[in-house]
Curated annotation (Swiss-Prot):
PANTHER family for the chain: LARGE RIBOSOMAL SUBUNIT PROTEIN BL17M, RIBOSOMAL PROTEIN L17
Protein name as it appears in the record: Large ribosomal subunit protein bL17
Self-association state and partner proteins as the record states: Part of the 50S ribosomal subunit. Contacts protein L32.
Signal peptide stretch: none
Stated family: Belongs to the bacterial ribosomal protein bL17 family.
Gene Ontology biological process: translation
Origin organism lineage: Bacteria, Bacillati, Bacillota, Bacilli, Lactobacillales
Originating species: Lactiplantibacillus plantarum (strain ATCC BAA-793 / NCIMB 8826 / WCFS1) (Lactobacillus plantarum)
Pfam families the UniProt entry points to: Ribosomal_L17 (PF01196)
UniProt keyword annotation of Disulfide bond present: no
Cellular compartments per GO CC: cytosolic large ribosomal subunit
MF GO annotations: structural constituent of ribosome
Cross-referenced Gene3D superfamilies: Ribosomal protein L17
Length: 127
């Protein structure tokens, strides 16, 4: 299995991919460098494929990888419903992509970064 090292140690690289994948699932799109986006694309596709399975084993594998962050807060009078990134993945994204076999993300190139000229892209989930 080949992958990009992204100038980081394995633990730093794993943490970076966890954070970017979780941000992509919570927000629907992220802006990052091209190399990072191409790596996050593969991990995000794996997470959405787990969400499509929807069983307990898939939920535990996804929970072991993703960060435990709040994705959405809904207030209905006195009731407050908090949805985590994992819940959003399995309740919203899994059913949304049930008929799609891969290719859940799209990459758009944008302007180079001002400081170092690195190629920036927008990675977003396909509707």
């Amino acid at each position: 299995m080949s992958y990009r090292k992204l100038q980081r140690t394995s633990s730093q690289r794993r943490a970076l991919l966890r954070d970017l994948t979780t941000s992509l699932i919570v927000n629907g799109k992220i802006e990052t460098t091209e190399a990072r986006a191409k790596e996050v694309r593969s991990t995000a596709d794996k997470m959405i494929s787990l969400a499509k399975k929807g069983d307990l084993s898939a939920r535990r594998k996804a929970a072991a990888f993703m960060r435990d962050v709040v994705a959405d807060v809904k207030e209905d009078g006195d009731n407050v419903a908090v949805q985590t990134a994992l819940q959003k993945l399995f309740s919203d994204l899994g059913p949304q992509y049930a008929d799609r076999n891969g290719g859940y993300t799209r990459i758009y190139k944008t302007m180079p970064r001002r400081g170092d000229g690195a190629q920036m892209v927008v990675l977003e989930l396909v509707d």
